[in-house]
Amino acid sequence: MAWRTTLVKTQLLNTEWRQRQNRRTLVFRDHFRSNRNKFTLALWTLFSLTAIPGSLPPSISVEIKAQANPNDRVTERRDMVVRQIRRRDVTNPLVLSAMETVPRHRFVPNDASLQSRAYADTPLPIDQGQTISQPYIVAYMTEALQLPPNARVLEIGTGSGYQAAVLAEIATEVYSIEIVPELATTSRELLNELGYDNVHVRMGDGYGGWPEEAPFDGVIVTAAPDHIPPALIEQLAEGARLVIPVGETYQAITIVTKQAAGSSSEVTLPVRFVPMTGEAER
């Protein structure tokens, strides 16, 4: 009889163990279901930081795309950074983060053909015969500034406002000058709409800079003069950089570093920008 009693006790213990396991399974399943979106997003982030582009499992990619707002175009921005920028030796994490954050398509005209190329590595036409620079050049010039923490930056040539938005993700204050009144107005309105309240846009001639707000921790020019405007060097803080495309038919990005004993310059990358207008025309 003792073995029968033991058998009954064993059966009862097994039954209780199964019941506990079933309860745990139900709790885990409910918890997993309620947190599935968080889990998937975390997994997507892990893969995006470590995997080769295109290597994500299709099931994960499809689920993320279904949950994302199609107007955000987040995946396109991520691909732009990975394929066009990081692979070409732009490595500053603040610059990469800014390029992945700013919605470039919002700064491109609302035309189907142009919108389809909003994240292609190419300049695109905007209003008033001007262009929005290709993403790689924006990232390259931003990184070349080597901005310190809490930087104050001067931009010459607001254009669409895209470069200013990228700078605003990194710098504390951005001062941007646009000589075309229509572009100054539209870029200011769009930047305000997107929440970039640390960008200050004014209409004016960029050759003279913005002396009231000098000195700056960096100056960037997004149109090409045939010479470097002296005022822009004067308005640099000591140790700060001016990044500017220089030339007429053939242009190259020139980096000028202001030093106590003067300034030094380095010519780096051949480029093609729209001409800088203003003082030089008079």
Which residue stretches match the model-derived regions?
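Bacterial N-terminal signal peptides that target proteins for export
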Residues: R20-T45
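Class I SAM-dependent transferase core
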Residues: I60-L154, A165, I170, T185, ...
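SAM/dcSAM-binding transferase cores
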Residues: W3-R4, K9-N22, F28, I60-A68, ...
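Bacterial N-terminal signal peptides
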Residues: T40-P57
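Conserved nucleotide-cofactor-binding alpha/beta core module
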Residues: Q146-S264
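Compositionally biased, intrinsically disordered low-complexity segments enriched
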Residues: L13, Q21-R23, R33, N69, ...
